[in-house]
Amino acid sequence: MNYFNIGKIVNTQGLQGEMRVLSVTDFAEERFKKGAELALFDEKDQFVQTVTIASHRKQKNFDIIKFKDMYHINTIEKYKGYSLKVAEEDLNDLDDGEFYYHEIIGLEVYEGDSLVGTIKEILQPGANDVWVVKRKGKRDLLLPYIPPVVLNVDIPNKRVDVEILEGLDDED
């Protein structure tokens, strides 16, 4: 079974079994809702166990969660640094033109018939995501995910068609 990272437990919160989670999901309210089941992975990315969310609230930049049947700091302190993941079968269906990062990373990028490179990372600097494209013999290319640049995303064929606008490629 495939799992996808949704957050990391960075610390405990108080004495009643709450944990601070640095979330990396766009669906925190759903992922951390009471009764949701998540997979717990250790620092070596090994599956530890399935956990059920007992409570969730936001505090500043963190999601504060508590696991069912784990209501004391001594029970949960060992989970600091562990990752929370969701099973692939539990991923939400997305609207047209929306993609999960794991679907985009690894796709080949083409301008016309010319291979530009492969998407290796996605950045979130502001209003739009920026795709980092690894190229042979050149520096990485930063492509904003906006309609004039990204023309077509073909997940089944692992291909993205783009138009590299003037000023985006400083090596040309």
Swiss-Prot record:
Keywords: Chaperone, Cytoplasm, Ribosome biogenesis, rRNA processing. GO terms for molecular function: ribosome binding. GO terms for cellular component: cytoplasm; ribosome. InterPro entries: PRC-brl_dom, PRC_barrel-like_sf, RimM, RimM_N, RimM_N_sf, Transl_B-barrel_sf. It is found in: Cytoplasm. Residues 95-168 form the PRC barrel domain. Gene3D superfamilies: PRC-barrel domain, RimM. GO terms for biological process: ribosomal small subunit biogenesis; rRNA processing. Its main location: cytoplasm. An accessory protein needed during the final step in the assembly of 30S ribosomal subunit, possibly for assembly of the head region. Essential for efficient processing of 16S rRNA. May be needed both before and after RbfA during the maturation of 16S rRNA. It has affinity for free ribosomal 30S subunits but not for 70S ribosomes. NCBIfam families: 16S_RimM. Belongs to the RimM family. Binds ribosomal protein uS19. The PRC barrel domain binds ribosomal protein uS19. This is Ribosome maturation factor RimM. It comes from Streptococcus pneumoniae (strain JJA). The gene is rimM.
